[in-house]
Amino acid sequence: MFTQCEAIQCRTLFPVQDSPSIKSTYKVKTSVISPLTFLFGGIKKNSYLDTKTNQNISIFEQKIPIPSYLVAFVAGELEYGKISERCGVWTEIGLCQKACHEFKDAEKYIQIAEEYFNHPYEWEIYNLLVLPFSFPYGGMENPNVTFVTPALLAGDCSMSNVIGHEISHSWTGNLVTNKNWKNFWVNEGFTIFMERKLDSALLGEDMENLESIVGNNELIADIKMLGLDCEYTKLSPNYGGNDPDDGFSTVPYEKGYQFLIYIEKLIGKDNFKEVMRKYIKKYRYKSVDYTAFKEVLENLIKEKLKDDSKKIIDQINWDKWLYEKGIPSYKCEFSSKLLKEAESLAEDFLQEKEDKTIALKTFKEWHTNTKLAFLNYLSDNKNKINEKIAKNLKNELNLSEDYNSEIKYMWYLIALDKKMEEEIPNIQNFWKLMED
């Protein structure tokens, strides 16, 4: 048993003012038949076995005020693995060792985020829960028990950036929370920004640029799918009483990220970092809209940039960024050497001039994001892929044997488009795994 409360599902569990504008602390007593384990989003204060009823009894406490959408609990036959003094992972029996290896960088991510924000991780412990394959929800930043999809267990730590995203929420989203769902970007745009700062620190700045390019491509695709005139393509949409999940897309994530990158380029990285630090310090434990960030930003601009402050403040067109539909008018320019390498190898395959040995070696050495950029380029040019090229891709790069589910997914879409009958059993097995 497990929960998913974001955006407005907590009201189905118990009577609650189910709005992110309202935060509260809580203390919970749980019971579950032994040998099952019950976890609740908080710090376990006590636990014991009631021998009369054969029930495992636990007391959990959440001392930091949180909104209802972050309430989470799970019960099942679980095992725990320790990553560091404050980080660990819960899984179904048999997956724990694999998960500990996959998420071994969790502590590094926390330390980098603490340095960037100049603010400690306040939640005491950071535990992950690997969900069952029957509910492979990408990631949910529930305090003290972050839920993640089992698809992250690729075996090579190639999907750890998802953990970076959820850890970043410990500051942007969980400490400082969007006041309402039209300000969802205050959670997710800020968190994408921080996720990429973490990846930049661990994997290099060019990886941040590559992720930004891929994110922009996904943003444009989502906006076109929704329709350029759709209300939900605004950074701050009016849901009109509808379920916020009805308008879910990459818009609050990627358009929000691009707005922050635009501001960072305008005032400089060091100044922007100071804005983020002041923002977290001032509004921790609170629910805010964008005006809270705007206030901190403009105050710092006046303090640090003095003579140029009015000119810079006037350059930031908040109404345009927040309420303009469609693709952002301001084009953020990102350049990535990794993207060029990925597209170059893809072109070699399309022109049938790849060196088999070098191609496999290069592909194996790439990070998942670079591999996905390679496959995205092929997908965009799939009209150029003939039967021979498709077989070369499969045989020379061992794409069907890749442990990463995103790589397999992208490859199988190409294989289906090219009617590769030999891949049908692999595709069926992949689909069955997602259903189990």
Task: Describe each PLM feature range.
Residues 281-435:
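Beta/coil-rich, acidic/histidine-enriched accessory regions frequently appended to metallopeptidases
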Residues 39, 137-139, 422:
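Generic domain-boundary/flexible-linker signal
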Residues 28, 148, 411:
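Divalent metal-coordination and catalytic microenvironments
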Residues 60, 89-353:
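Hydrophobic alpha-helical and helix-loop surface patches within well-folded domains
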Residues 14-16, 115, 134, 246-248, ...:
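Generic recognition of flexible, low-complexity loop/linker segments
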Residues 36, 65, 152-153, 416:
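Hydrophobic pocket-lining residues within nucleotide cofactor-binding pockets
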